[in-house]
Structure formats: structure tokens, C-alpha cells
Amino acid sequence: MKTAENIAFGKRVAELRRNAGYSQEQFAFKCDVDRTYIGTIERGEKSPTLNTIEKIALALEMSKKELFDY
């Protein structure tokens, strides 16, 4: 479900992923999730689980706090 929070978080993930030089496919592999799941997060269509948030932060080599710093 698209919410303002999901959309903002998705934009943040997409921006950080691109800045790190990853395609969605590369990033999904690094996060150990499906590429389509990354796409739904970036479009604000899904709320990632805490486990996925942890994987995203680790893949981007940042803390969860930094991930939400937007």
C-alpha cells in the first residue's frame, strides 16, 4: 500500500542504491531478496520488514539510523 512514509523511504533507498552504483538486480542480490521486491520498495508499494531493512542497511554499509535520515 502506498503511503507517504513508504514513498519517502523508497525514494531514499533508490537514491542510495544509485549513488552506490548498483542496479536493482545487483542490489537485490547483495540484499538476498528478489529484484521485484526492491522495485516495489523503491516505488513505495511495499513496507519492508525489519529483516529487509537490516539487509538494505548492510548492503549500503550504513546504520539503520542513517538509512532513515531523510
Predicted regions, residues:
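A detector for short, charged/polar N-terminal pre-domain segments
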Residues: M1-A8
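Short basic helix-loop element that most often maps to the first helix and adjoining turn
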Residues: K11-F27, L60
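Helix-turn-helix DNA-binding elements, focusing on the entry/boundary residues of the two helices
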Residues: V13, Q24, R35, L50-I53
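Short alpha-helical DNA-recognition segment
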Residues: G21-T40
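DNA major-groove recognition helix of helix-turn-helix/homeodomain DNA-binding modules
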Residues: N51-E66
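Short amphipathic recognition helices of helix-turn-helix/homeodomain-type DNA-binding modules
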Residues: F68-Y70
